[in-house]
């Protein structure tokens, strides 16, 4: 049996260890919510509709989430595991849904917990409360949240794809094609372009191994 290891930088003269940990936490946070599609449509809409920079949106959201016990626990534990890795060379993290957690996939731990614990409603309810500060028109907000909740693919629903989403606004074109926001009925087709019969552990491990193909987010096409 031969152990493998890697060398990692844990601090520099300009980035002390604690600041490095802060950077690791912010990277984990952005990966969990924005990269994985949990808050992506919300941040993009606020940027386009209100002119609020992504950095402002995510700094404000980070502070808001410090009020939630589940999120704070996740954040504290991730920080401790990063600290273990940096100071002891091993994370010593329990498996999540049967998936081993190492230094290189620790950043995915919370999105895995969201799926394992089915925290979808908890997280999206938090995001909806946060979004209230931007005072979007009520009908736009309702449409946006419906879209966001379905944009993240929940494992329990993979066999329901493709699914149809009827909205009152052309939100997808507004965010991705520079179209004017129009109040008119639209119908989207949401697809999970993967093996719909995959096991739950396979689904979870693909958040790392299929990260370059946007795994975990629905593909969107306009029907009408």
Predicted features by range, described:
Residues 48-201:
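Terminal or standalone catalytic/regulatory effector modules within metabolic enzymes
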